A protein has these predicted regions:
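Surface-exposed, low-hydrophobicity beta-strand/loop segments enriched in small/polar/acidic residues
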Residues: 1-146
Length: 146
């Protein structure tokens, strides 16, 4: 069975936390998640999310599109958890990643203070010995945290 985005890539060191979802928001499994100024979960993008608040990966889909802030919660992988996400472009093994405008992981190419890094690209499924670079649309393993 092939890995799917939002699945956990390793069974140890797993950290999961629930966050209240922002009003009129849908969070999709396997996509990067950030917290807005009110502390509610929203889709992370290149302009939404801060290192101080963290960037996470949703492990379930939650539809709060017709709800108020906090009506629903989403469970997210946090900390140093290894999780499958979708590459939003080419990423080299070991590079730090950030969210793109589709909440996918892309290579973080500028200095740390200028971008919201969420983790590091480790490889594809079953590539512990000789990982390869990722291409747009690949399902990849990211170790969250810096």
């Amino acid at each position: 069975m092939a890995a799917a985005i939002g699945q956990l890539a390793r069974s140890t060191g797993i950290e999961i936390q629930s966050f209240n979802v922002a009003a009129s928001t849908t969070i999709t499994k396997g996509k990067l998640v950030a917290l807005n100024a009110s502390g509610h979960a929203v889709a992370a993008t290149s302009s939404v999310g801060t290192v101080a608040r963290g960037v996470f990966v949703a492990i379930e889909t939650v539809d709060n599109s017709s709800g108020s802030a906090g009506d629903k919660e989403v469970r997210c992988a946090i900390g140093n958890t290894y999780v499958y996400v979708e590459a939003g472009g080419a990423v080299k093994v070991g590079e730090t990643v950030k969210a793109d405008n589709n909440s996918d992981a892309v290579a973080a190419t500028t200095i740390f203070a200028a971008e919201t890094h969420c983790g590091r690209y480790i490889g594809h499924e079953n590539e512990e010995a000789d990982p390869t670079d990722a291409a747009d649309g690949d399902v990849i393993i990211v170790r969250l945290g810096l």
